[in-house]
Design a protein with these regions (language model features):
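Membrane transport/envelope proteins' first extracytoplasmic loop
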Residues: 1-221
C-alpha cells in the first residue's frame, strides 16, 4: 500500500536463569538498521555471534554489566553493551499488562547471523510501519490512519496475502495463522508510558508546590 512502508521486526523469546536464581525472559530482536533504533549506553553493538546487547534498565535490575556472560539455550553469550530501545522505554511484555516488569522481562539484540540460528526453533512475525505522508499531527489523526491501515491488513489476511507489497509482507497470514496483536504507536505502552508518567508526575509536583507555598505563606505571613 502506497500510504505506508512496512518493516519486518521479527523476534524470538528465550529464558535464562538470573543471578537471583529466577527465570528471566529476553525478547531478542534481529539487528535493526532502519526503524526502532537503539541508543548505546555502554559498550558496543555485537560484532560476533556469541555477543548480545540488552536493555540497560533490565541489566541494572539484574546486576548485569558489560562483559558479563549469559547462558541461553545452552550457549554462552557475552554482554557486549547496554542499550536503550526506542520502542521499549519501559518493559511491557504485553501491551495489555497493567504494569511493566523490568526485573523479569527485557529486550535484547544479537547479530543478524546469530538471529537466524535462534529463529530456527521459533519466530514471532512482528512488523513495524511508518506513514509515507510523515508523522500524524496528533493522536486523533494517528488513530484514523491506523484504523484505515488495520482495515487493509484484515483485507490482506482474508485474501491470503495478495499481490500488493503489504500483502506480500503479510503473506504468512491465513486462516490458521492470524493477527495476534495490532498496536499503533499512540497506544503502545512500551513506547509511551515513561513520557506519560513523567507528564502526570509534573502535574502532581506543581500541585504540591502550590500547597507548599500556601502553607509557608500562612506560617510566615
Amino acid at each position: 500500500k502506497d500510504d505506508v512502508t512496512i518493516y519486518p521486526d521479527f523476534y524470538v523469546e528465550r529464558t535464562y536463569q538470573g543471578k537471583d536464581k529466577k527465570e528471566k525472559k529476553l525478547r531478542i530482536y534481529e539487528s535493526r538498521d532502519e526503524i526502532n533504533k537503539l541508543c548505546i549506553m555502554d559498550g558496543a553493538l555485537p560484532k560476533n555471534d556469541n555477543e548480545i546487547v540488552i536493555d540497560r534498565m533490565f541489566a541494572d535490575n539484574n546486576k548485569t554489566k558489560t562483559g558479563d556472560k549469559l547462558t541461553i539455550d545452552g550457549k554462552t553469550y557475552t554482554v557486549s553493551g547496554l542499550v536503550s530501545f526506542s520502542d521499549y522505554t519501559t518493559m511491557f511484555e504485553n501491551n495489555t499488562d497493567m504494569m511493566f516488569d523490568s526485573v523479569n522481562f527485557g529486550v535484547a539484540m544479537g547479530t543478524k547471523e546469530e538471529f537466524k540460528t535462534l529463529s530456527e526453533k521459533s519466530l514471532t512475525y512482528n512488523y513495524a510501519w511508518t506513514y509515507n505522508a510523515g508523522d500524524p499531527a496528533d493522536d486523533i489523526e494517528e488513530k484514523k490512519w491506523s484504523d484505515d491501515l488495520m482495515d487493509t491488513v484484515v483485507d490482506a489476511a482474508g485474501e491470503g496475502g495478495g499481490a500488493t507489497m503489504l500483502g506480500s509482507m503479510l503473506g504468512v497470514l491465513n486462516m490458521d495463522n492470524g493477527i495476534d496483536d495490532y498496536v499503533p504507536r499512540y497506544a503502545n505502552q512500551a513506547m509511551n508510558f515513561a513520557g506519560d508518567d513523567l507528564g502526570s508526575d509534573r502535574g502532581s509536583m506543581l500541585a504540591f508546590l502550590y500547597i507548599l507555598i500556601a502553607v509557608l505563606a500562612f506560617i510566615f505571613g
